[in-house]
């Protein structure tokens, strides 16, 4: 009888193990340049303390599972984390490898993922320490995480960066360096690379990322694309661009169901604005002029992916 129970227990465990290994991991992956906190933005009405809760609501509504942020200072990341129950993040400051300067942080839902390993490296000839690489004008950092999808037991790699806005050589070399690091940290694993690359889909460093076949642009491989604008808006709600400077790249073993540029906006009150009434609406309905604003000077991009 005991032998029978043992055999049954082993059979059940084996079956569960097979089921978990066969189960697909379906995830919402995003990239969001949240714009660094600065006085000029506050004067213009785009201050971080106004934008932060709106950013958090957007993230929660669209159900980001894992997302990379760019430009955030430590206090911004802590405020965002406080507004996102059930999320944690990893990533260090680019100036000192601790807290100073902008971060390329990775946020993830703790109910869906377990952080297995993580780290950071600089986009330079000396990636193991804070440094400026090649012809860049600022130190640039890439943070990475190895995450286990709790339901399926599958693991994935996630890289997030912010490339230099001036250095052309730096962007190309950074693209090569990141691909080298991907092989070091878990070749063969489903891999995501998010970030503000400071170049659109027509530039050489973009081509460097997809030319080897190790990465695909999710915009090009998604079954469905919803992208009514580019990804940089400069806080202009009336502007349009075809340039995608924020990207989500995926390894070939990741299937992308859909891709979207989320052009959500919000409104702030205008001084002395008078309510308008329309003959086409009930009399109790008034429309009050407000200023349209974007939660950041970049739109977030998000994909639904499976592996």
Where are these regions (language model features)?
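Bacterial Sec-dependent N-terminal signal peptides
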Residues: 1-25
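N-terminal, active-site-proximal structural segment of metallo-dependent hydrolase catalytic domains
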Residues: 5, 21-83, 94-102, 176, ...
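Active-site metal-binding loops of divalent metal-dependent hydrolases
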Residues: 32-34, 161-163, 196-197, 299
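Short, solvent-exposed loop/turn elements at domain surfaces
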Residues: 36-45, 116, 168, 226-229
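Structured beta-strand-rich core segments of catalytic domains in phosphoester-bond hydrolases
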Residues: 66-155, 159, 258-263
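Active-site neighborhood of phospho(di)ester-bond hydrolases with catalytic His/Asp-centered motifs
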Residues: 68-70, 91-92, 192-196, 217-221
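His/acidic metal-ligating clusters that form di-metal
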Residues: 141-161, 168-209
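Metal-dependent phosphoester-hydrolase catalytic domains
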Residues: 169, 182-191, 199-307
């Amino acid at each position: 009888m005991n032998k029978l129970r043992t055999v049954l227990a082993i059979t059940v465990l084996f079956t569960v193990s097979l089921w978990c290994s066969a189960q697909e991991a379906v995830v919402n992956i995003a990239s969001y340049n949240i714009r660094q906190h600065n006085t000029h933005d506050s004067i213009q009405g785009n201050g971080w303390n106004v934008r932060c809760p709106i950013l958090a609501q957007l993230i929660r509504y669209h159900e980001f599972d894992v997302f990379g942020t760019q430009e955030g200072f430590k206090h911004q990341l802590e405020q965002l984390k406080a507004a996102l129950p059930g999320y944690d993040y990893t990533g260090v400051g680019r100036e000192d490898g601790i807290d100073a300067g902008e971060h390329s942080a990775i946020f993830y839902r703790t109910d869906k993922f377990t952080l297995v390993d993580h780290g950071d490296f600089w986009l330079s000839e000396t990636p193991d320490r804070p440094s400026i690489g090649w012809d860049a004008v600022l130190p640039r950092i890439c943070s990475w995480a190895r995450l286990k999808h709790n339901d399926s037991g599958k693991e994935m790699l996630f890289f997030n960066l912010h490339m230099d806005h001036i250095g052309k050589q730096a962007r190309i070399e950074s693209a090569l360096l990141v691909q080298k690091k991907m092989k070091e940290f878990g070749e063969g694993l489903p891999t995501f690379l998010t970030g503000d690359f400071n170049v659109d889909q027509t530039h050489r460093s973009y081509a460097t990322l997809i030319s080897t076949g190790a990465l695909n642009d999710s915009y090009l491989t998604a079954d469905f694309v919803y992208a009514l604008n580019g990804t940089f808006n400069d806080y202009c709600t009336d502007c349009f661009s075809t340039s995608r400077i924020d990207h989500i790249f995926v390894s070939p073993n990741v299937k992308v169901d859909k891709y979207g540029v989320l052009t959500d906006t919000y409104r702030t009150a205008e001084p002395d604005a008078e309510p308008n009434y329309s003959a086409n609406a009930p009399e109790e309905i008034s429309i009050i002029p407000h200023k349209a604003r974007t939660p950041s000077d970049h739109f977030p991009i998000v994909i639904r992916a499976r592996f």
